[in-house]
């Protein structure tokens, strides 16, 4: 079951130390973490921890507040109307529905930062400003497990001597087993309240669930090496300073490790974790991975859930828009590339297209064979012209005849011839530029080599001169 309480209207300020340590004006309903009873109020520092000046410059002056916390007087430095937690819903049992570790962390003691600030005179004047309110925890109370002695597992970990207890009692955060503002816990034997701890932080609370110590003959303790000392059952309730080896889980828990059966929860208390408990002696099932790389290798088209790219299994087929293009394969020969001849096949003579190829006498590489494919014609001939003599006869392209069909094989052949000539011209220009750059690079390397030799000779000469000066 979950209890949700209404949070206060506003976060409360840091309370004075007097209220936290059982000092003047600390009602037990407000601060039950002092370790003192209502009769011990006003005895700040005797049994419930030391109190401080209510008008502390660090914590502000609350004595002139128009509204006081219940049970506080104007002289006691009441904390105002924002201290009491919201009222708890009534329950059938005597135990508070919320454990002690639930309640918001009301800072009952000054932090180390405040103590350092107090030692500084300048900060002492600055600290008269209103204090920043302490942030409250979420007011949601979950039912916790209750041990045999009536204390929760968290209480067992918080109020031991190893829990960094502060001068005000309780744990390091100033809390106590009873909880801040909580109703009194369950009654002890014979209807009496369980005894509380003595001086704060010195003695652990008496554990009612501890089993009685075994007495030897004549009321003495049994010998250490006797039969009674062989692996006695460890009772976590008898040693509150020790943390249990495993989280007991919600509901009442059997503290005897020799018995492995789980005590049933109280009637009417639904345990959401009951279905998760396995019978004794069984191992928990192995977790099933969400993604198995072996399964991915065996299966097709599966990607791990964290792979958002989805690019590995993307459809890589190219989708063409519109009607598919039918490829046309043409072959050209040297006769087609010769401007003085007409088109191949004995057709009518066409006016030659302007040739951008310089004098083709300086071609490098093998001469393309007849009926050469386009790919071999593009890659085989890389001419290099030495004198651009053909630029002078460039003419504007002639107008196509009236019956010119750009999709006819003849027109495509002419266009292919023009493209091949342009490619050869570009290849020749590239070869020229490459030769020029290579020559310049060689000259620069030679110049740098000479400079290196000259520098080395100069250094050697300088060393010789220095040696001669030293000798003379």
Swiss-Prot record:
It is a single-pass membrane protein. The keyword Signal does not apply. Keywords: Host membrane, Membrane, Transmembrane, Transmembrane helix. Residues 364-379 have a biased composition (Polar residues). GO terms for cellular component: host cell membrane; membrane. Its main location: host cell. Coiled coil: none annotated. Residues 1-104, 116-280, 317-407 are annotated as: Disordered. It is found in: Host membrane. The keyword Transmembrane applies. The chain crosses the membrane at residues 452-472. Residues 116-130, 204-217, 232-242 have a biased composition (Basic and acidic residues). This is Uncharacterized gene A10 protein. It comes from Alcelaphine herpesvirus 1 (strain C500).
